């Protein structure tokens, strides 16, 4: 059966790592890589792997969408330009998976709400942030047991894994992640903190999640829920590991994670980028399965 053809916008760290994952997919075929710098290493690497490339940005891709049957596009550029990209692509019937913090479309965290997005047939879904993909499943694991008044996450990532796009979007990162802690994670109030650690050798991504429950926490039920969710995330991010917890202190529930990447293009310590690209690939594969089946209800997370 024919694969669903895709374009990637942004040949940086995230776009290139995502390309490696898509090349392994049984249902997705990466066809185009889009950039703005003619001398970009990412564009050169994509050409070496057999993709068509353009350094003319989104406008260099648009004339080829129909001829190359591009059905899904991944935007791994910047929150500042995503709105333009999304408008031009969705107007031409292309589904957009947004890996920037722009959050034009609804948030998607695969083990929490991907199935609902497949059924609603949205043209744009937002993958929140790397910190959001790592921590929101844990907030939800608590909130599905009992109400969470406050959820706070701290994502600690290696400085080497944080490219210029992420650094420009730090404010958007914190706002978008906090919003998704509430909208997807189920906390009444959310807060997100990112720590960029310059240590050498680089440290693997570490995440700390604190939830304040409204009532005394159900220790057994929350513990079981957390372990179940860890298993769900590990289906597509094998390096997603519970290092400690859940730890209970009054109404506070604390969970400590480590996220190691697969090492496709990026080093294994860059689990923050790997969980983002793995989540985007999983989302696209489920959307593609629905496209092939011709019915949104046939694909599940």
Swiss-Prot record:
Q: Coiled coil: which residue ranges?
A: none
Q: Which GO terms describe its molecular function?
A: acetaldehyde dehydrogenase (acetylating) activity; NAD binding
EC assignment: the record states 1.2.1.10
Q: Give the residues the record marks as binding NAD(+).
A: 161-169, 272
Some GO term, biological process aspect, for this entry: which one? catabolic process
Catalysed reaction(s) here are: acetaldehyde + NAD(+) + CoA = acetyl-CoA + NADH + H(+)
**Active-site annotation:** 130 (acyl-thioester intermediate)
Key words of the record: Aromatic hydrocarbons catabolism, NAD, Oxidoreductase
Q: Which family does it belong to?
A: Belongs to the acetaldehyde dehydrogenase family.
Q: What is this protein called?
A: Acetaldehyde dehydrogenase
Q: Which gene encodes it?
A: mhpF
């Amino acid at each position: 059966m024919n694969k669903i053809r895709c374009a990637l916008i942004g040949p940086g760290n995230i776009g290139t790592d995502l390309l490696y994952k898509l090349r392994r997919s049984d249902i997705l075929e990466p066809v185009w890589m889009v950039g703005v710098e003619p001398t970009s290493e990412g564009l050169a690497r994509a050409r070496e792997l057999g993709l068509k490339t353009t350094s003319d940005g989104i406008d260099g891709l648009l004339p080829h969408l129909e001829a190359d049957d591009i059905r899904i596009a991944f935007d791994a550029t910047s929150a500042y330009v995503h709105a333009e990209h999304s408008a031009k692509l969705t107007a031409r019937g292309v589904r957009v998976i947004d890996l920037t913090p722009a959050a034009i479309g609804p948030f998607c965290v695969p083990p929490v709400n991907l199935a609902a997005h497949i059924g609603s047939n949205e043209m744009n879904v937002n993958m929140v942030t790397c910190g959001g993909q790592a921590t929101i499943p844990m907030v939800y694991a608590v909130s599905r047991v009992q109400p969470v008044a406050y959820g706070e996450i701290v994502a600690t990532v290696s400085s080497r894994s944080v490219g210029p796009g992420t650094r420009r979007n730090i404010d958007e990162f914190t706002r978008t992640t906090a919003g998704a802690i509430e909208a997807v994670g189920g906390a009444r109030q959310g807060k997100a903190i990112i720590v960029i650690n310059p240590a050498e050798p680089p440290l693997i991504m570490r995440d700390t999640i604190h939830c304040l429950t409204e009532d005394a926490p159900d220790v057994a039920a929350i513990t079981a829920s957390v372990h179940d969710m860890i298993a769900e995330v590990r289906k597509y991010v094998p390096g997603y590991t519970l290092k400690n917890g859940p730890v209970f202190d009054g109404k506070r529930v604390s969970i400590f994670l480590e996220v190691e990447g697969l090492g496709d293009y990026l080093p294994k310590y860059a689990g923050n980028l790997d969980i983002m690209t793995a989540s985007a690939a999983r989302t696209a594969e489920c959307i593609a399965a629905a496209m092939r089946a011709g019915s949104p209800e046939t694909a599940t997370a």
